[in-house]
Amino acid sequence: MPLSTQPPASGERYVLTACLDNARNLSSLLRAVHFQDHATCFATANGLKVTVEDAKCLQANAFIQAEIFQEFAIQEESVMFRINLAVLLDCLTIFGASSLPGTSTALRMCYRGYGYPLILFLEEGGVVTVCKINTQEPEELLDFDFCSTNVVNKIILQSEGLREAFAELDMTSEVLQITMSPDKPYFRLSTFGNAGSAHLDYPKDSDLMEAFHCNQTQTNRYKISLLKPSTKALALSCKVSIRTDTRGFLSLQYMIRNEDGQICFVEYYCCPDEDVTEADL
């Protein structure tokens, strides 16, 4: 019997039940935000959001819409818990390299509520494994207050363009400087490493540029150590939306197509490292 059609054991009431025919559609997105051991899971009728934070300066969110799941049932307005992300990923890939080509691991994920473990039923080739992962009290998450009304500049790039940039830029630099402007250089990435300064420019009519909406010239610096985790999402994505707001906060939203061709999103928020004056440029 497929996991998605198995009824819960008698007397068990889950506040959250989610089923996937292919667990990789979840694990690949979770890897894209796995730069700390713990994550906060937040579920509503719209789907599941998994949030990871670092040093109160960086926040990553993986969004898995309810439509991605073969079954997604929630009995409360919202469900929230903290979990060890490394353990969750280990469980989701428990069949690992033993998987035969063309096969996938089916997943049924159940949660009874506060204080209870997250239960994973994983099935592949007729073999079912059950994992129970302890959940924790969720911590208060950062509110980056990044709203669209305060966005000053926004561009959408094909991800290959940004992947090439990260491969070419000098990662010995402590910061990545991002310039966005309605005039030249339009979109510029700069580093200041051991070999000196390096700049990479993207004209607004570049084949890689899908959208260009810049209202004013803005130059901000961001710690490369904070941006490096986002390259995990970049590697999986087909497009990336880059936005800055009036405070210089950065939003990187990656559009990721899963193995079934469905679109999911991973978003990174990063605060600027320092203000850059005209004298610095």
Regions found by a protein language model. Give the residues of each.
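DNA polymerase sliding clamps and clamp-related checkpoint/processivity subunits
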Residues: 1-172, 179-281
